[in-house]
């Protein structure tokens, strides 16, 4: 393709919106102009499905739930006055709470301002707030955020001890829709013990984000926690960032939450247009579909050329992979769908895996994210402007990939602020919703995650049974333990006991670890 043809194709496939300062270029993806006509019928159905979802239909059929994260940034589109009013009130309450913390109306027991937040949440309840922090921490006039998003004992110990110097001025936020998810529950229990062991009051500094009537909601009310914010059952964790899960950390670091919501709402409006060529989410989802032949045959590589978006690829991993990675479609056909997502940041990628992207296996497409405006405080030194080099690296990598026949698309924003982040998140949320309609999967459930939780619960139950069996002090082989417990996995018993023996002197495994079936197990 010569230069004139490339330019003509670029102009034909470019989408832009002046109000958001936004461009989407899919000209280097496997999309043809006639695809707009060929896909018109299936997209017409997808647009109608998304409209029905926003109108309050039970879109998550498996769980019998509405899907309402699009209402969060524009309460007026919610399907009932009750929902609309509750969203509006929540936004106002969070804004007021954030201001009260920042201006010192709410203080610790010594009358001092809070300086830190210890955030306990897993999955989207941790990734969303982390993205908020990383995106706006340079403009922050507020609190420093720390995250506990795992049950790694070493990680828990390190993170709790790291806040010890400022413990008296640290808020604790616990995020759990049900209040029973193991990771945030264990994190909360450890944090609670840590605070009390250091002679501090937990309830006066604890905040819950949870569903009304949940175990966490009841606990927070009974113990008179500092505040409680709502996580409705019609909002999933991976799409909760425009609710309390994202707004509270934004408010606590001094970001403009209304600007963030307005950006998302503006993008929602652009992506309600029922015309593929004039709908950026439709263009994006079509590019994904064509690239992977509708079967997710290509990975999505996310390369934002801006440090503040470094964790965006991790955020998209959950949004895209948990939403689209499904074994069965909605008609119960086995389809094994999904798109794998990974990424880095530019120009770090230049010195990491771009080598393989350019010359290795062709099983991906690249999603570049570009920000045009550079901060004024970084000036030219020795005739070099860092922003020019960053842009040059992006354009150069893009050209090198195209020359190698590698598909790529570019999302560009004029500047990066709360509005553009809200718009960027909304763009991908809407593209995921439309893509799910194209491949006929439920984007709002997570049966694989639930299966993992059930399996983990089974392992914990088995461990307790092993401990009780070995309380008699008798020596046994693994097979004898397995038979006594009528277990279906000797391997699981071995793995449990290997862990126990490493962490407790009461358990012993005598014998050669290379022959685990010969080991003699006992408890003293």
UniProtKB/Swiss-Prot annotation:
Pathway: Carbohydrate biosynthesis; gluconeogenesis; Carbohydrate degradation; glycolysis; D-glyceraldehyde 3-phosphate and glycerone phosphate from D-glucose: step 2/4. It catalyses: alpha-D-glucose 6-phosphate = beta-D-fructose 6-phosphate. The keyword Cytoplasm applies. The lineage of its organism: Bacteria, Bacillati, Cyanobacteriota, Cyanophyceae, Synechococcales. It holds the Pfam family PGI. It is an enzyme of class 5 (isomerase). One of its GO terms (biological process) is glycolytic process. GO terms for cellular component: cytosol. It is found in: Cytoplasm. This is Glucose-6-phosphate isomerase. Keywords: Cytoplasm, Gluconeogenesis, Glycolysis, Isomerase. Belongs to the GPI family. GO terms for molecular function: carbohydrate derivative binding; glucose-6-phosphate isomerase activity; monosaccharide binding. The gene is pgi. Its EC number is 5.3.1.9. Catalyzes the reversible isomerization of glucose-6-phosphate to fructose-6-phosphate. Its main location: cytoplasm. It comes from the Bacteria. The active site is at residues 322, 351, 453.
């Amino acid at each position: 393709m010569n230069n004139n043809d490339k330019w003509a194709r670029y102009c034909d496939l470019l989408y832009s919106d002046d109000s958001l300062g936004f461009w989407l270029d899919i000209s280097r993806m496997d999309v043809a102009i006639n695809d707009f006509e060929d896909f018109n019928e299936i997209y017409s159905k997808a647009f109608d499905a998304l409209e029905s979802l926003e109108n309050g239909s039970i879109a998550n059929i498996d769980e019998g739930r509405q899907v309402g994260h699009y209402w969060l940034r524009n309460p007026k589109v919610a399907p009932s006055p009750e929902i609309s009013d509750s969203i509006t009130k929540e936004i106002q309450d969070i804004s007021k709470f954030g201001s009260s913390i920042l201006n010192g109306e709410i203080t610790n027991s010594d009358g001092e301002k809070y300086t830190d937040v210890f955030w306990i949440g897993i999955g989207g309840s941790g990734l969303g707030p982390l993205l908020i922090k990383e995106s706006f921490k340079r403009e922050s006039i507020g609190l420093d955020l720390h995250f506990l998003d795992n049950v790694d004992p070493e990680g828990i110990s390190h993170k709790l001890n790291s806040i010890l110097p400022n413990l008296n001025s640290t808020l604790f936020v616990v995020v759990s829709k049900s209040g029973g998810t193991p990771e945030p529950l264990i994190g909360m229990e450890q944090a609670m013990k840590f605070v009390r062991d250091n002679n501090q009051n937990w309830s006066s500094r604890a905040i819950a984000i949870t569903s009304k009537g949940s175990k966490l909601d009841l606990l927070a009310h009974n113990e008179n926690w500092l505040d409680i914010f709502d996580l409705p059952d019609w909002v999933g964790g991976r799409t909760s960032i425009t609710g309390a899960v994202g707004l509270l950390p934004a408010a606590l670091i001094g970001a403009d939450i209304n600007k963030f919501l307005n950006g998302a709402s503006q993008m929602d409006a652009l992506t309600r247009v029922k015309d593929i060529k004039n709908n950026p989410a439709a263009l994006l989802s079509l590019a994904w579909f064509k690239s992977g032949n509708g079967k997710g045959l290509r990975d999505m590589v996310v390369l934002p050329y801006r440090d503040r978006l470094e964790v965006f690829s991790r955020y998209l991993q959950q949004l895209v992979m948990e939403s689209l990675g499904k074994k069965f479609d909605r008609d119960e056909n086995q389809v094994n769908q999904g798109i794998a997502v990974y990424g880095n940041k530019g120009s770090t990628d230049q010195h990491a895996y771009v080598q393989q992207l350019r010359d290795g296996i062709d099983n991906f497409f690249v999603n570049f994210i570009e920000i045009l405006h550079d901060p004024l405080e970084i000036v030219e030194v020795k005739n070099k402007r860092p922003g020019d080099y960053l842009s040059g690296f992006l354009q150069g990598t893009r050209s090198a990939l195209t020359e190698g026949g590698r598909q790529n698309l570019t999302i560009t924003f004029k500047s990066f602020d709360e509005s553009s982040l809200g718009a960027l998140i909304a763009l991908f949320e809407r593209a995921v919703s439309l893509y799910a309609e194209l491949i006929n999967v439920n984007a709002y459930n997570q049966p694989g995650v639930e299966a993992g939780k059930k399996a983990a619960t089974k392992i914990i139950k088995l461990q307790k049974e092993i401990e009780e069996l070995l309380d008699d002090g008798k020596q046994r082989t693994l097979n004898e333990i397995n038979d006594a417990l009528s277990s279906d996995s000797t391997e699981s018993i071995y793995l449990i006991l290997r862990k126990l023996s490493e962490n407790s002197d009461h358990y012993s495994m005598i014998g050669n670890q290379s022959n685990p079936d010969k080991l003699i197990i006992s408890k003293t």
